[in-house]
């Protein structure tokens, strides 16, 4: 089945206000840049975005925060985005903060059809407030629910028209598991190749998980925090 779509704008034509979107990426690495830009252009609002972090003020999810298109963020680290901090402090943005390992497992569980699981991480802290706790073998555990989305936006290095994807190094991050945990998965790739060009043993996301794929453009290597030393 040919899953190619001509552009990011065409790929999100069914995205509606109030949707929950899983967005791959770690820092500024492996984020679906073209899809985020398309959402900004389309103006879709009241979104719940599930992503490791919220980008920076002028890039990534930060572009959607500027337009007040995001209602709620489910994240692990948001310290690089000043606007994010301001919106949360003013009560204009809901935040569900997760330990990073718990965040990853919640998405994996959602993709595996597991509704909830117990973890010791976060017990006795603010992330456990309002959640069921239980003791197992003398240890206290917190109940966490699996995460699923209406959409998942993933960014891959290479892909083919059937939706098979290969990620590159750190850019893999949360993308593969997010591709399993949404009703509709859109992949943007740096290079769209012909069938047979991808080594099956190196495919990270099988095409069965992907609904639409397109070749992105204008990718820019961003550095989130530059550290230099005088020698």
Where are these regions (language model features)?
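Conserved alpha/beta enzyme-core scaffold
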Residues: 1-231
């Amino acid at each position: 089945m040919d899953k190619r779509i001509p552009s990011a704008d065409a790929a999100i034509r069914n995205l509606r206000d109030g949707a929950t979107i899983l967005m791959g990426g770690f820092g500024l690495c492996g984020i679906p840049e073209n899809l985020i830009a398309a959402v900004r252009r389309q103006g879709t609002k009241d979104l719940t975005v599930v992503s490791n972090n919220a980008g920076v003020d002028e890039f990534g999810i930060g572009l959607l925060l500027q337009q007040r298109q995001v209602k709620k963020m489910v994240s692990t680290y948001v310290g690089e985005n000043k606007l994010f901090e301001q919106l949360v402090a003013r009560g204009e943005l809901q935040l569900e903060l997760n330990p990073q390992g718990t965040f990853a497992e919640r998405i994996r569980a959602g993709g595996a059809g597991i509704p909830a699981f117990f973890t010791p991480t976060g017990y006795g802290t603010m992330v456990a407030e309002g959640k069921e706790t239980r003791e197992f073998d003398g240890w206290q555990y917190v109940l966490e629910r699996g995460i699923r989305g209406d959409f998942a936006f993933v960014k891959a290095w290479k892909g083919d028209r059937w939706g098979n994807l290969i990620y590159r190094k750190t850019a893999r991050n949360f993308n593969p598991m997010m591709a399993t945990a949404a009703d509709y998965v859109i992949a943007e790739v740096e290079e769209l190749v012909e069938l047979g060009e991808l080594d099956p043993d190196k495919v990270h996301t099988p095409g069965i998980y992907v609904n639409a794929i397109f070749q992105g453009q204008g990718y820019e290597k961003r550095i989130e925090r530059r550290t230099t030393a005088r020698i």
